[in-house]
Amino acid sequence: MKLIIDGRKKTVSHRGDIASLLRKLKVRREEVVVKLNGRLSSETAIVGARDKVEVLRVIFGG
């Protein structure tokens, strides 16, 4: 699958859901928004070999 994280493009081999992908990447779910094939996605969505996943960091604070 194609992965974009922090603006960097990668090709990654992964079978499973978004939650397991984030664990594999050591990314905290609370700090990101994930798009799967251009649409916002839940952590239970299943990722396939031909999918495009974009991990966008959320900026928060006061």
Write out the residue ranges for each language-model feature.
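Ubiquitin-like/PB1-type beta-grasp interaction modules and other compact soluble beta-rich domains
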Residues: M1-G61
